[in-house]
């Protein structure tokens, strides 16, 4: 597994030096360049600076081509180090470019959003969008990931909440994360560390995503459908939060799971506990997804905190869970989380 380090940006030069690279290039976007590139590059000799526009739509092959070209012009080699500094969009493209340029260069990731620190930068999945999200990509483990808590100090509240959706997911999957999250008073280094380490542990057991890694889809089956139905107005993390509530209701009916624990947790984190759609609309969206995956879409169901099963669920059960979690009062808005970063 990749070397996961927790510490300030000032340790980046020593992480880079350990790899003895020919050259170092930073890949970042316009927003993170302004906020963090100078600090990250301190102590690294004449790094190449590649800055892409900010936004999911730039997670594209066109952007990858532009980066490959620039690396070639700069004489970047397989023994050079590409450092992706940014949110999940940047870390996904950095991984993709590093895995494909000259069949693979050295790669370091410095995730700067909560979502990227607990999820996107961990586990070796890289990619770009191409007629669909993440349609072109590779599995490529970075040489290091540096989780620098300080970078979250500039992250907007909305992006913190986006990441908290994934934190809530880990809390249902892991008792240690649950214990921290239910007493949430702001994003702590410990909470991020426990989430990140949990993902590392799962991924280490299943890099190719054939088995255990599927548990990381908890909340995502209904969540994706909700995200799509809202035309992506509902952000990923909030849709996942709604999806966790749906999955918990399914768990309650099938395995006696206490969905009140999920509700309490989501409220503590300032996340929505209900979705704004009709059950039939979400089911229809899920059926489309199921078709896209050759009818093999399964559901991750909480049995108790720290324990889930992965199985197909009868539509009637799903429908009841979707009806029980509908909240058309305010399209999933909710109170602020118990503190800030
Ligand atoms: N590879 C994986 O396993 C995996 C897992 C989950 C998500 N993803 C991908 O991650 C992407 C979403 O990641 P994201 O939520 O980080 O989005 P993002 O990268 O678009 O970042 C969100 C916003 O925050 C800004 N930002 C980043 N760091 C900042 C900082 N420190 N201060 C202020 N602003 C900052 C960005 O410029 C952007 O505007 C999606 O493309 C998704 O497919 C990948």
Curated annotation (Swiss-Prot):
- Localization per record: Cytoplasm
GO function term, MF aspect, one: 3-dehydroquinate synthase activity
Which cofactors are reported in the record for this sequence? NAD(+); Co(2+); Zn(2+)
Which annotated residues bind NAD(+)? 54-59, 88-92, 112-113, 125, 133, 151-154
The catalytic activity, as recorded, is:
7-phospho-2-dehydro-3-deoxy-D-arabino-heptonate = 3-dehydroquinate + phosphate
Q: What is its main location?
A: cytoplasm
What EC numbers are recorded for this enzyme? 4.2.3.4
Task: Identify the metabolic or biological route this protein is part of.
Answer: Metabolic intermediate biosynthesis; chorismate biosynthesis; chorismate from D-erythrose 4-phosphate and phosphoenolpyruvate: step 2/7
Among its keywords, does the record have Isomerase?
Answer: no
Query: Record's GO cellular component, any one?
Result: cytoplasm
What are the binding positions for Zn(2+) in this chain?
Answer: 166, 220, 236
Q: What does this protein do?
A: Catalyzes the conversion of 3-deoxy-D-arabino-heptulosonate 7-phosphate (DAHP) to dehydroquinate (DHQ).
Q: What's this protein's family per the entry? A: Belongs to the sugar phosphate cyclases superfamily. Dehydroquinate synthase family.
**Protein name listed in UniProt:** 3-dehydroquinate synthase
């Amino acid at each position: 597994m990749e070397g996961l380090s927790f510490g300030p940006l000032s340790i980046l030069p020593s992480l880079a030096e350990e790899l003895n690279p020919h050259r170092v290039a930073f890949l970042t976007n316009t927003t993170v360049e302004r906020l963090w590139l100078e600090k990250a590059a301190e102590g690294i000799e004449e790094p190449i600076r590649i800055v892409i526009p900010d936004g999911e739509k730039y997670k594209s092959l066109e952007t990858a081509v532009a980066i490959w070209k620039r690396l070639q012009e700069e004489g970047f080699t397989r023994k050079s180090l590409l450092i992706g500094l940014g949110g999940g969009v940047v870390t996904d493209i950095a991984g993709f470019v590093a895995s494909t340029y000259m069949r693979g260069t050295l790669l370091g990731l410095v995730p700067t959003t909560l979502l990227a620190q607990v999820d996107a930068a961990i586990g070796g999945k890289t990619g770009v969008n191409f007629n669909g999200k993440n349609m072109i990509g590779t599995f490529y483990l970075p040489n290091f990931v540096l989780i620098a808590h300080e970078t979250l100090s500039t992250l907007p509240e909305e992006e913190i909440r986006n990441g908290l959706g994934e934190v809530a997911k880990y809390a249902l999957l892991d008792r240690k994360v649950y214990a921290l999250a239910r007493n949430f008073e702001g994003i702590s280094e410990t909470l991020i560390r426990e989430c990140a380490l949990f993902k590392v542990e799962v991924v280490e057991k299943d890099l190719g995503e054939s088995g255990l890694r599927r548990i990381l889809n908890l909340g995502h089956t209904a969540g994706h459908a909700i995200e799509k139905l809202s035309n992506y107005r509902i952000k990923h993390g909030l849709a996942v939060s709604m999806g966790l509530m749906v999955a918990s209701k399914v768990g309650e009916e099938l395995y006696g799971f206490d969905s009140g624990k999920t509700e309490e947790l989501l409220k503590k984190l300032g996340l929505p506990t209900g979705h704004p759609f009709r059950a039939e609309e979400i089911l229809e969206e899920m059926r489309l997804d199921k078709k896209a995956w050759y009818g093999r879409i399964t559901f991750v169901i909480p049995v108790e905190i720290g324990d889930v099963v992965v199985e197909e669920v009868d539509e009637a059960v799903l429908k009841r869970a979707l009806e029980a979690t509908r909240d058309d009062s305010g399209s999933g808005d909710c109170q602020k989380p118990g503190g800030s970063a």
